[in-house]
Regions:
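Short, conserved phosphate-binding/catalytic loop or strand-edge motifs used
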Residues: 262-268
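A short core secondary-structure module
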Residues: 321-376
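A short, Trp-centered hydrophobic/proline-enriched beta-strand micro-motif
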Residues: 290-298
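Active-site-adjacent elements of ketosynthase-type condensing enzymes
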Residues: 302-311, 370-376
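Alpha-helical interface subdomain recognition
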Residues: 2-253, 257, 262, 274-275, ...
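Short Gly/Pro-enriched turn/cap motifs at secondary-structure boundaries
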Residues: 302-305, 330-333, 348-350, 383-391
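Flexible, small-/acidic-enriched active-site or ligand-binding loops
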Residues: 367-399
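Long, acidic (Asp/Glu-rich), low-complexity accessory segments flanking structured domains
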Residues: 395-417
């Protein structure tokens, strides 16, 4: 609908640029050139004696991390173009999709030229990466100049939000580009989240309660825990793209519910990639059916992201079993799970990743009265701002026993490598969770902006409010396409650690921005605990921290780019 006396016909015809796909396609080489020049400049900064130096990357962290963000923008725009071209070929590139695509290019081209926000307090500019204005020579083309001047206009944003209002309650704003089977899966889990999760999520959060076991049982019946486990082991053998869709829609309902399958995904990936035949036959069917629930036990109090320096010890006894001694922290869903994927040091003569081994450590599920009944194991809850529903714990091990047969792969010293093999899937899934949280923020904020009236009209009729909603929708679609691309690569057997890292990096920032802007739209009410957006803000904050903090993620991406 038109707002504030605007004429609908005029707004529709003026908002979308002529020959849009031709314009955006022509802009891609200019961005690619800037990225290539930045990579060359940063590589020169961090090279010593003909080799890229880790110490110099650390010393030039702003430049290196800026390169990671620039590469992420470059890949994001490429995937938006791929998405748009595919929709156009199928006759599905409608007005909403055109506006999403157009605004995305207009905004991201400006940010590449003027500064990319790594977060709300850090903007990285081309000068930080050793480039001058001459690096932007390709940005002087008519196509790029047209997009920068006109693509992200107030008229475009206003028209986009008008279309969003017309489609209020739709599964998403804009076509996903996925096939019909995946959209059927999406619809199934969207309905479930609307019926069983959304009405209860805020109470679970405010009361800091565990997600009811009935929800876990229902999700198990729907196949959530065996989604990507091969059929021969009792799973559904579906794609990582299906995992994205399920994670996205459940996290849209509540991030805690969307994260229930994360540890099962990690455990299954570990066992499929590194387990013995006996371990696969024993554990995978139980994981797929949720007969057992796993938890990931990696992080230690003084190591954080530096997993290679873990100190928890695993000592092999004469009977071939192991005893675990040490401390772990930030262990999600630790109390009521049945098995821990536990990383510990089996070689005391090492101080890096080479002495680490992975165990499938069995435990007895706890109760509220006795959360950790297994001998040799203690734990205490860590109270947290958000990401509730499974609870976080510190764990202590003192002579905790693990059967020798539960050493993953039956070989010591392989634990870190085995864990690394799960990072692609874990980061893709986390990116999907971030999209779900961002979409939740948009859903809540848009409804509030429509319902809340100030100065005689709905908030959504004010350009700065509608502009926030428009940019939420645009960036959600950008993050979505980057995430789906990384899932596609994974499904087709291609290395995708770079793209998965980019998807997680961008998705986390998009989720936080959506939650923050969603709360801003609520004004003072957003600061009240009774309003759902307050929960979403707390939940969104974790996405830039876990599964690789944003700084670590950018560091990893930079190392891959620089070689």
């Amino acid at each position: 609908m038109a707002h504030d006396g605007q004429d609908m016909t005029q707004m529709t015809t003026s908002a979308i640029l002529p020959e849009l796909l031709t314009l955006t396609r022509a802009a891609l080489p200019a961005v690619e050139t800037v990225f290539e020049r930045a990579r060359d400049a940063v590589r020169e900064m961090v090279t010593e004696d003909g080799r890229v130096s880790g110490a110099l990357i650390e010393a030039n962290q702003t430049a290196a991390h800026g390169l990671a963000w620039l590469a992420t923008y470059n890949q994001s725009l490429q995937q938006m173009q791929r998405w748009a071209d595919a929709l156009a070929a199928d006759g599905k590139f409608g007005e909403m999709e055109q506006l999403l695509h157009q605004i995305a290019f207009g905004e991201y081209l400006h940010q590449v030229a003027g500064g990319i926000p790594m977060n709300q307090g850090e903007v990285v500019r081309l000068q930080d990466m050793g480039l001058g204005w001459d690096a932007l020579s390709g940005f002087q083309s008519t196509e790029v100049q047209t997009l920068m001047a006109q693509a992200n206009s107030q008229a475009a944003r206003t028209r986009l939000v008008a279309l969003m209002e017309d489609q209020a309650g739709a599964t998403m704003f804009g076509a996903s580009g996925l096939d019909e089977e995946l959209e059927m899966i999406r619809d199934q889990f969207r309905r479930y989240a609307q019926e069983k999760v959304e009405p209860n999520a805020h109470d679970w959060h405010l009361k800091d309660e565990l997600i009811p076991i009935e929800i876990i049982e229902e999700l198990a019946e729907m196949g959530v825990f065996g989604l990507t486990i091969p059929e021969e082991f009792g799973g559904f053998g579906l794609s990582k793209a299906s995992m994205c869709v399920v994670s996205e829609e459940l996290s849209r309902g509540y991030i805690g519910v969307g994260s229930l399958g994360t540890r099962s995904e990690i455990a299954a990936e570990l066992i499929i990639a590194g387990g013995t035949d006996e371990q696969k036959a024993n554990w995978l069917p139980k994981l797929a059916s949720a007969e057992i629930l796993p938890t990931a036990v990696f992080t230690e109090p003084n190591t954080g992201s530096d997993l290679g320096s873990l100190r928890t010890r695993a000592v092999k006894n004469a009977d071939g079993d192991y005893e675990i001694t040490g401390n772990k922290t930030w262990i999600t869903h630790a109390a009521r799970t049945h098995v821990m994927t536990l990383l510990a040091r089996t070689n005391p003569d090492t101080t890096d990743h080479r002495g680490l081994s992975m165990f499938l450590a069995e435990k007895t599920p706890g109760t509220d009265e006795n959360p950790f009944p297994t001998p040799g194991m203690t734990g205490g809850e860590i109270e947290v701002l958000g990401y509730r529903g499974m609870k976080e714990y510190e764990l202590g091990f003192d002579g905790f026993k693990v059967k020798g047969e539960n050493l993953l792969g039956g070989e010591e010293g392989k634990g870190f490598k085995q864990l690394m093999e799960t990072f692609e899937s874990a980061r893709i899934q986390t990116a999907a969770r971030a999209i779900g949280v961002a979409q939740c923020a948009l859903d809540i904020a848009m409804q509030y902006a429509q319902d809340r009236k100030q100065f005689g009209k709905s908030l959504i009729n004010f350009p700065r409010v509608s502009g926030k909603l428009a940019m939420m929708a645009v960036e959600i679609m950008i993050a979505r396409q980057l995430t789906y691309f990384s899932a596609w690569e994974k499904d087709h057997g291609q290395r995708c650690d770079l793209e998965a890292g980019m998807a997680k990096l961008l998705g986390a920032r998009v989720a936080w921005a959506a939650a923050d802007n969603g709360l801003q739209i609520h004004g003072g009410n957003g600061f009240a605990l009774e309003y759902k957006i307050s929960r979403v803000l707390c939940d969104a904050r974790i996405l830039n921290i876990f599964e690789g903090a944003a700084e670590i993620q950018a560091q990893v991406i930079a190392r891959r780019l620089l070689g």
